[in-house]
Amino acid sequence: FTAYARVWLTSQDLETVERFIQESQPLPEAVECHLMAGECDVMLRIVAADLTAYRQFQIDHLTRIDCVHNAKTEVHMEQVKLTSELSV
């Protein structure tokens, strides 16, 4: 099960961003972490056994990071393309 968590931090200053990065690094469920330009501050790709396991991760870990102001989850309905090929 894969979910994407859009995360808003309490502030966008360097200290807050670095604190989030440091606290999210040890979380094995968070397989990707991207600092974003746009609506949210961070986008995480989370891999869990199922939706229940993801919800437990969100409750136990993600929303307990003190600099997380808000987190919203996106779940894809169907993967229609995945490639690593680049035409150069």
Where are these regions (language model features)?
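A compositional/biophysical signature of low hydrophobicity enriched in polar/charged and small residues
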Residues: 1-88
